[in-house]
């Protein structure tokens, strides 16, 4: 095509000559423009944000940080289960440290165990204390329910919960 041919084609104002208009596509159904004005893509629905469900009871856990906090916990009350061991000391607020060594597995597996333990501790509604939870290598094989029961058992043995 030469420039002469392009200049010879009349171009409608504001439309790209390469793309067919909505009325020119033979596959397009009649009235399709009206459907777009309703439903999830409607102009009034585009600005609205989806509402999040309310958070589960318990809220976010505060992490135990610093070597000194972990050192103090060595003298704390202890409890042990099949998959975890716990140590705790009374404190003005609940702080949790979760330790999952490389013996448990690669990073993906360790993070999965940590996520499960955080959720379990959040759901247990623990009293104010500094708490250390150390996962054993067997924790990678445990189901969520087994891990939950084991953490609860270890916390009962240590005296943190009844």
UniProtKB/Swiss-Prot annotation:
Q: Which residues form a coiled coil?
A: none
Keyword list, A-Z:
Endonuclease, Hydrolase, Nuclease, RNA-binding, tRNA processing
Give any single GO term for biological process. Answer: tRNA 5'-leader removal
Listed EC numbers: 3.1.26.5
InterPro entries from the UniProt entry: Ribosomal_Su5_D2-typ_SF (IPR020568), Ribsml_uS5_D2-typ_fold_subgr (IPR014721), RNase_P (IPR000100), RNase_P_CS (IPR020539)
Disordered, as annotated region: 1-67
Reactions listed under catalytic activity: Endonucleolytic cleavage of RNA, removing 5'-extranucleotides from tRNA precursor
Q: List the biased-composition ranges (Basic and acidic residues).
A: 21-31
Annotated GO MF terms: 3'-tRNA processing endoribonuclease activity; ribonuclease P activity; tRNA binding
Any one GO CC term of the record: ribonuclease P complex
Question: Which cysteine pairs are joined by S-S bonds?
Answer: none
Under the heading NCBIfam families, the entry gives: rnpA (TIGR00188)
Q: Could you say which protein family the record assigns here?
A: Belongs to the RnpA family.
* Task performed by this protein: RNaseP catalyzes the removal of the 5'-leader sequence from pre-tRNA to produce the mature 5'-terminus. It can also cleave other RNA substrates such as 4.5S RNA. The protein component plays an auxiliary but essential role in vivo by binding to the 5'-leader sequence and broadening the substrate specificity of the ribozyme.
Q: What is this protein called?
A: Ribonuclease P protein component
What gene name does this entry carry? rnpA
């Amino acid at each position: 095509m030469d420039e002469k041919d392009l200049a010879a084609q009349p171009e409608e104002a504001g439309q790209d000559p390469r793309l067919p208009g909505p009325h020119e596509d033979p596959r397009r159904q009649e009235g399709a423009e009206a459907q777009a004005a309703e439903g999830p893509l409607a102009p009034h629905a585009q600005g609205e944000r989806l509402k999040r469900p309310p958070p589960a009871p318990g809220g976010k856990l505060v992490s135990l940080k610093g070597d000194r906090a972990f050192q103090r916990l060595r003298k704390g009350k202890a409890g042990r289960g099949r998959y975890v061991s716990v140590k705790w000391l009374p404190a003005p607020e609940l702080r949790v440290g979760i330790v999952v060594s490389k013996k448990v597995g690669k990073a993906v597996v360790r993070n999965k165990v940590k996520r499960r333990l955080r959720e379990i501790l959040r759901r247990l509604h623990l009293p104010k204390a500094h708490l250390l939870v150390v996962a054993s290598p067997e924790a990678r094989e445990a189901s969520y329910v087994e891990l939950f029961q084991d953490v609860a058992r270890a916390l009962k043995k240590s005296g943190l919960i009844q």
